[in-house]
UniProtKB/Swiss-Prot annotation:
Its EC number is 4.3.2.10. This is Imidazole glycerol phosphate synthase subunit HisF. The lineage of its organism: Bacteria, Pseudomonadati, Chlorobiota, Chlorobiia, Chlorobiales. GO terms for molecular function: imidazoleglycerol-phosphate synthase activity; lyase activity. It is an enzyme of class 4 (lyase). It is found in: Cytoplasm. Its main location: cytoplasm. The active site is at 11, 130. Keywords: Amino-acid biosynthesis, Cytoplasm, Histidine biosynthesis, Lyase. The gene is hisF. Pathway: Amino-acid biosynthesis; L-histidine biosynthesis; L-histidine from 5-phospho-alpha-D-ribose 1-diphosphate: step 5/9.
Amino acid sequence: MLAKRIIPCLDVRDGRVVKGINFEGLRDAGSILEQARFYNNELADELVFLDISASLESRKTTLEEVLKVSGEIFIPLTVGGGINSVERAREVFLHGADKVSVNTAAVNDPFLITRIAERYGSQAVVVAIDIKKTGEDYLVFTHSGKKPTCYEALEWAHKVQELGAGEILLTSMDRDGTKEGYDNDILAKISTSVHIPVIASGGAGNLEHLYDGFTKGHADAALAASIFHFRQHSIREAKEYLRQRGITVRI
């Protein structure tokens, strides 16, 4: 069985790590480099760096910050925010990223996924899908959760897989920052219907939530921010907890 991954996420705005609730009310969560070093030493499996306002402000991710982070860590780095072309993806890779995450740009130009995958391989392309429950459906949102799209979550997940995505980062906007646990219903629905890895995101508030994301949501990886940024739990602690409950993790 493949080991389940624990992935801290650095939501970056104006050169600092921030964290909000339901994509709103951002508060400072520390220095980018300090947090990156901490997670590297904490046995995180990967690190995600998301410039959360790049697409909203129609600008590019700051490459200097990516370069600094990549130079400080020895774990895979995924970078997202404002990546809207193959050339921009190339620049991010040249500055040390192992994977790129696309969201808004992929909805606007779905074949961007294919073009990046053809150049760098599917394993280097993560499609971030931000979803919100609307009636009985889960709709996909872009621009840091500001703009609804016409896509239903499961439909879009299948489409990005067909286009060449190597992984899906599924974030529940309803659960984001609430510490109420992942939305395991939609997580399980998508995880069991695609053949690429799905990363659970949005809502982790304790170690049991991570366990539930793997067992109830069938996620391949669990992304979290608040519980790690503010030192409520450590990644080492999380992995030991999961190991004791029968989840295969890298220690």
